[in-house]
Swiss-Prot record:
Record key words, sorted: Nucleus, Ribonucleoprotein, Ribosome biogenesis, RNA-binding, rRNA processing
Localization, UniProt: Nucleus, Nucleolus
Source organism: Arabidopsis thaliana (Mouse-ear cress)
GO molecular function, one term: mRNA binding
Protein name: H/ACA ribonucleoprotein complex subunit 2-like protein
Biological processes annotated in GO: rRNA pseudouridine synthesis
Subunit (UniProt): Component of the small nucleolar ribonucleoprotein particle containing H/ACA-type snoRNAs (H/ACA snoRNPs).
Keyword Oxidoreductase: no
């Protein structure tokens, strides 16, 4: 019985860590449902090679005019690493959303290293997708993108 309560206490401590370490600029923050759908979209995009990982790649892609969906981790330290991303996304018309954990973001993006941000694109970096694969990815992308835009307007 004692180990059960200790396990429950450790889970509660982990939940508190997310709340404490979350950056103050992490708005709009995805809720649990949106977060789950976003991570599923990232997993599909990673499998199809339609994903840019890391701040440098994401910034480079946005500046070159590539459209997509930017997902930023909210527990980045130091925060200066990602403070320019929301402004860059707004200027380029790219929807963006924050998720609480960089570790979860990396896991969804099929990498072992924690990732600050990812950009989900509809076109792969190399090669082409079949029409069926593109249609599936596009429907998921549009659904998540619409939810993020709705969330962003409710925050502002």
């Amino acid at each position: 019985m004692g180990s059960d309560t200790e396990a429950e206490k450790s889970i509660q401590k982990e939940k508190k860590k997310y709340a404490i370490t979350l950056a103050p600029i992490a708005k709009p923050l995805a809720g649990k449902k949106l977060q789950k759908r976003t991570f599923k979209l990232i997993q599909k995009a990673a499998g199809k090679k339609c994903l840019k990982r890391g701040v440098k790649e994401v910034v480079k892609s946005i500046r070159r005019g590539q459209k997509g969906l930017c997902v930023i981790a909210g527990n980045i330290s130091p925060i200066d690493v990602i403070t320019h991303l929301p402004i860059l996304c707004e200027e380029a018309g790219v929807p963006y959303v924050y998720v609480p954990s960089k570790e979860d973001l990396a896991q969804a993006g099929a990498t072992k290293r924690p990732t600050c941000c990812v950009l989900v694109m509809l076109k792969p970096a190399k090669g082409d997708l079949t029409a069926e694969e593109l249609a599936k990815l596009k429907t998921d992308y549009e659904q998540v993108s619409d939810d993020i835009k709705e969330l962003a307007t409710s925050v502002i």
